[in-house]
Amino acid sequence: MSQAAPEIIENPDGTKSIITYKTENGEKYKIIQKVRDVKITERVHRSVAERRSWAKFGAEKNSPPGPNNSTTQFGETVELLLDRNWRKIIEARTQKLKASASKTITCRLCGNAHYTMNCPFKTILSEISALEDPAAAAAGPGLPEEVPAGKADSGITATGAYVPPSRRAGARDPSSDAYRDARERDDSCTLKILQLNENADENTLRNELLFPFEPIQKVVVVRNKETGRSRGLAFVTFINEDMAEKALHFLDGRGFMNLILRVDWSKPKVPAPQ
């Protein structure tokens, strides 16, 4: 019995649904696979590309380009680190992978799966709290009489419901000047680095490019969500604005890993009033 050709459906989100059928033990099963085509451009040296186009000979004379699984054994890809501290670099990468594997992103304000700085509910949390409990909002800081101190500190009300820290009595408004000033201080010390080599990760930037400006608070390389490859963009947060400005003048236009860097502030600076 011939097997029917698979049915392919194009989805609006750019994916494809492949529908096939199979029969096992007298029962027919429908199999739906959802796939996404990802195009990855690999940059190699010119001589490597030329060797790949060489004509094959011997037993592989008429074989198509590329390795043949039946006659070629693939080895393990070995990364060469030309650095005296390569052991420390490998240990740091291992620790970072372990930390990222056990760490989940949770907003401190609403508890959803996104960063606190990107929370879409910053400006309305206080208004919702006031509408739900006008008496507590009017009373200001302090604990309600019906809530024991131990439960109030842990965010548990008398009814057993959990209250986020931003909605507890005495909590600061996320849209207040204090929160906004803290965010602006972070932006004032942050630079964006453009035209980065795709092979440059956070450890490479810290150890080979940014070491004259230590201590570095944070280094983030922007990556493609689908492939995990670098987009050639990174954000670096320094200890203060003066150190960030020194790094800006030193790194902008400098060559790094065969590319010319472009460095600027993460947000445009507002000129001081005359």
Curated annotation (Swiss-Prot):
Q: Where in the cell is it found?
A: Cytoplasm
**Keywords per UniProt:** Cytoplasm, Initiation factor, Phosphoprotein, Protein biosynthesis, RNA-binding
Q: Where is the composition biased (Low complexity)?
A: 138-150
Indicate the transmembrane segments per the record.
none
Per the record's keyword annotation, is rRNA-binding included, yes or no? no
Q: Where is the composition biased (Basic and acidic residues)?
A: 170-184
Specify where the region named Disordered lies, as residue ranges.
138-184
PROSITE patterns registered for this protein in UniProt:
RRM
Limits of the RRM domain:
189-268
Q: Does the keyword Metal-binding apply?
A: no
InterPro entries recorded: eIF3_g, eIF3g_N, eIF3G_RRM, Nucleotide-bd_a/b_plait_sf, RBD_domain_sf, RRM_dom
Q: Which SUPFAM superfamilies match?
A: RNA-binding domain, RBD
GO cellular component terms? eukaryotic 43S preinitiation complex; eukaryotic 48S preinitiation complex; eukaryotic translation initiation factor 3 complex, eIF3e; eukaryotic translation initiation factor 3 complex, eIF3m; multi-eIF complex
Name the Gene Ontology biological process terms.
formation of cytoplasmic translation initiation complex; translation reinitiation; translational termination
**Which Pfam families does the UniProt record give?**
eIF3g, RRM_1
The PTM Phosphoserine maps to S63, S129, S166
Q: State how it assembles.
A: Component of the eukaryotic translation initiation factor 3 (eIF-3) complex.
Similarity comment text for this entry: Belongs to the eIF-3 subunit G family.
Q: What does this protein do?
A: RNA-binding component of the eukaryotic translation initiation factor 3 (eIF-3) complex, which is involved in protein synthesis of a specialized repertoire of mRNAs and, together with other initiation factors, stimulates binding of mRNA and methionyl-tRNAi to the 40S ribosome. The eIF-3 complex specifically targets and initiates translation of a subset of mRNAs involved in cell proliferation. This subunit can bind 18S rRNA.
Output the PANTHER family linked to this UniProt entry: EUKARYOTIC TRANSLATION INITIATION FACTOR 3 SUBUNIT G
Q: What is this protein called?
A: Eukaryotic translation initiation factor 3 subunit G
Origin organism is: Candida glabrata (strain ATCC 2001 / BCRC 20586 / JCM 3761 / NBRC 0622 / NRRL Y-65 / CBS 138)
Print the organism lineage: Eukaryota, Fungi, Dikarya, Ascomycota, Saccharomycotina
